[in-house]
Amino acid sequence: MSAAHDDAQHEHTFDSVDAGASATYPMQCSALRKGGHVVIKNRPCKIVDMSTSKTGKHGHAKVHLVAIDIFTGKKLEDLCPSTHNMDVPNVKRTDYQFSYIDEDFLVLIDSNGEEKRDVKMPEGELAKRIEKLEEEGKDFFVGVQTAMGEEAAIDVKEASNKD
C-alpha cells in the first residue's frame, strides 16, 4: 500500500462542525490571557500559566506559555516573542440530550431532534457519571466541546424537571 493511499484512508471531513468558519484565528502573543485558548504544537489548549521575560539586548520580550490540551489533558509549553502572532482555536461547546450508549459511542439528540452518533464515550469519572445517570433513567445533557475538527464529551448535567 502506498503512502498516498494510506493518507487518503485517514482523511476526514468535518463539514458539520462549522462549515466556513476557520478552525483558528491569529492573536498577538502579548494579548493572550490565562484561562484563554491557544494552539501549541498543533493542539488546542487552555492557558493555565503565562509569564513575560524582559526585553533582552537581542530583541523582544518573550512570553512563556503553559497550557493544557483541552482534549488529552497533556501539559504543553511554548515560548514566543510578545509581538508574534499565535493561533487561537475556535472552541465551541454544545449541550446535547443524552439518548443511550451504543458500544463505545454516545447517541445524543441535538436541538433539531436529530441523532448525533459520533461522540466517543469518555473515560474515567465522566463515563461513570453518564452510566449512573443512564441506569437511574434520568434525563440529562452531555456537554460536547469542539475545536480544530475534534470533539469530545466534557461534562454532564441533569435536566431540570419542570412539572
Curated annotation (Swiss-Prot):
Signal sequence residues:
none
The entry's localization annotation reads:
Cytoplasm
Q: How is it modified after translation?
A: Lys-57 undergoes hypusination, a unique post-translational modification that consists in the addition of a butylamino group from spermidine to lysine side chain, leading to the formation of the unusual amino acid hypusine. eIF-5As are the only known proteins to undergo this modification, which is essential for their function.
Record has Cytoplasm as a keyword: yes
A GO biological process held by the record: positive regulation of translational elongation
Q: Which InterPro entries match?
A: IF5A-like, IF5A-like_N, NA-bd_OB-fold, Rib_uL2_dom2, Trans_elong_IF5A_hypusine_site, Transl_elong_IF5A_C, Translation_prot_SH3-like_sf
Role noted for this protein? Translation factor that promotes translation elongation and termination, particularly upon ribosome stalling at specific amino acid sequence contexts. Binds between the exit (E) and peptidyl (P) site of the ribosome and promotes rescue of stalled ribosome: specifically required for efficient translation of polyproline-containing peptides as well as other motifs that stall the ribosome. Acts as a ribosome quality control (RQC) cofactor by joining the RQC complex to facilitate peptidyl transfer during CAT tailing step.
Tell me its family.
Belongs to the eIF-5A family.
Protein name per Swiss-Prot or TrEMBL:
Eukaryotic translation initiation factor 5A
Species: Neurospora crassa (strain ATCC 24698 / 74-OR23-1A / CBS 708.71 / DSM 1257 / FGSC 987)
